[in-house]
């Protein structure tokens, strides 16, 4: 059983946990901003209350926190997503991707999911490609990937 908890509803323990995860070397090595201080973290969480173009969720599986998924630059047509698993927890990437697709297509009602993947993050790129995301562009540091909802409907379950 998967449950999503909006970052705007986190308790103090969850806020601190996410702060630690966000700055963990295994996670922040694949983030544009490598380190944030706690005050910056709190300001970010506060801004989420007023910003409808961003949604961040803590992901629970059977009451255990397994990771974070997020949606940014949300429009009526598309959004960008991100994810990270609890440090040292293996095998939950597929669960997080499924929740991203489900939330984006069923709740946000977007047609296209997009992301930027660091070129040296081979593990993430492989996961996305296994889930039928395609590379539509690239720059010096990133692959630009996307998945259209129509492509999902054509896939076998």
For each feature predicted by the language model, list its residue ranges.
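Conserved acetyl-CoA pyrophosphate-binding loop and the N-cap/start of the following alpha-helix
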Residues: 87, 91-100
């Amino acid at each position: 059983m998967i449950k999503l908890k909006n970052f705007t509803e986190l308790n103090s323990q969850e806020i601190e946990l996410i702060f630690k995860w966000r700055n963990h070397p295994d996670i922040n090595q694949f983030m544009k901003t490598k380190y944030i201080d706690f005050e910056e973290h709190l300001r970010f969480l506060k801004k989420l209350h007023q910003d409808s173009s961003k949604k961040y969720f803590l992901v629970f599986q059977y009451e255990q926190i397994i990771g974070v998924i997020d949606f940014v630059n949300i429009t009526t047509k598309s959004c960008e997503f991100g994810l990270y698993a609890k440090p040292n927890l293996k095998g939950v990437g597929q669960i997080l991707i499924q929740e991203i697709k489900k939330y984006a297509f069923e709740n946000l009602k977007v047609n296209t999911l997009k992301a930027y993947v660091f070129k040296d993050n081979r593990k993430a790129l492989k996961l996305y490609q296994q889930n039928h995301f395609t590379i539509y562009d690239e720059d010096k540091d990133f692959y630009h990937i996307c998945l259209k909802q129509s492509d999902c409907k054509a896939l076998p379950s």
